[in-house]
Amino acid sequence: MKRLSSVAVLLALAGPAVAGDLLSVYQEARVSDPQYGGARASYLAGQEKIAQGRAGLLPQLSVNGSVNYTNLDARFPGSTFFRGGQHDFASDSFGVQLTQPLFRPINREIYEQGKLQARASEIQLNAAEQELMVRVSQGYFDVLLAQANLEFIRAQKSAIAEQLAQAKRNFVVGTATITDTNDAQARFDLANAQEVGSLNDLEVKNRALATITGKYPGGLAGLASPVSLLAPQPADIGAWVEQALGSSLQVEIQRVAVEIAGREIEKSKFGHYPTLDAIASYTDSKANSSAQGFGNALRQGVIGLQLQMPLYTGGAVSSRIREAVANKTKAEQDLENARRQSALSAQTSYLGVTSGLAQVSALRQALRSSEVSLESTKLGREVGVRTSVDVLNSQQQVANARKDLAKSLYDTILAQLKLKQAVGRLNEEDLAAVNRLLSKQ
């Protein structure tokens, strides 16, 4: 009772529960998962790189102005024209300048890099979405497996309790020894301990899923029975590896990174190039007095070209070129690493699916055999050739077979999703296909 009370308190503190199937939990996670939310924000930030890069190619308009008060003590020895002495006067000016870049190759490279960075942020968001699908599925099936384990243990505990009661009755009437009772009691105590551990494991798995969805899970749909899983198509591990090398999102991200690094080399080289801008400006200034003793008003309009040619930068440009070349080499190595990791991921997931399907088939047969063996053992006990301990062992074997089958099913489904993720093709329709394997409990 104390354990159940503790669980009730934990449930109350967990907040609103989210119930439903895999798709509904995924939709909840899209809204609430902080990792995916951060990826969305990064995507929006990355898209701004295009506008920022384009700005360097467009006209720049600026305005300036000033208002000044001057106190001047002037002396003009020997001058009969200029008045010396103390002068106080105010002045103000206003100006507008328009600059249009005509030749700024660095700005062009920044714009091209911005487009690539925006593309990279889009791919990263897609990768984050696929990763969210896998994390939600993993968390969802972890909860289902923990629930199944708890159900198996409770069923086993119930069967042991019946055997314990029967052993006690048989001992009283003299048809069984105290050994049978002690053995059943030991198994019952162990089942109690396993139940406590399973309850804790279920709580941990529920809370792990809640960190993704923001809500405590409740009433999740489980796998329907029977479940039919399909083999990967094409049934060729090499074909899946080729797809991963060509369309893996991690590989695509690194390809874009190599392009960006190449653009950075070109941008650095353009540090040796001149720049040319078209300039147009207008200035209006006036003062009510001056050192000469009279005021002035000036209006000036200027239009022209401004050329800047770097002659010597202390070796900074050459250093930046070497740095950019080294960074591109690193990006190329990162690309190769991404290709190898994607190939390994595709191979691992493919083998996980194929071996999982074989294991599911074998475990189904093992479960059928265990159930037949249990019935035979029960019959043997009735005729006196088997003991209650034999029945308990057979029941434990059935429970283990069911638990192993459930885990194998969940692992195989996850491997199927990860295989699609490895080749960059995991989408919501794949989750919908898994969802169709579920039924409300």
Where are these regions (language model features)?
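N-terminal signal peptide c-region/cleavage motif recognized by signal peptidases
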Residues: 14-15
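Small/polar, glycine/serine/threonine/aspartate-rich low-complexity segments that form flexible
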Residues: 64-100, 223-234, 266, 279-316, ...
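A glycine-/polar-enriched beta->alpha junction
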Residues: 27-37, 44-59, 95-113, 123-130, ...
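Transmembrane beta-barrel architecture of outer-membrane proteins
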Residues: 24, 91-93, 138, 183, ...
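Sec-dependent signal peptide recognition
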Residues: 2-8
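Periplasmic alpha-helical coiled-coil/stalk elements that build and connect Gram-negative outer-membrane
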Residues: 3, 131-243, 349-352, 356, ...
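Amphipathic alpha-helical coiled-coil scaffold segments and their short linker/junction regions
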Residues: 26-30, 215-281, 429-441
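Amphipathic alpha-helical coiled-coil segments
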Residues: 38-53, 128, 132-152, 162, ...
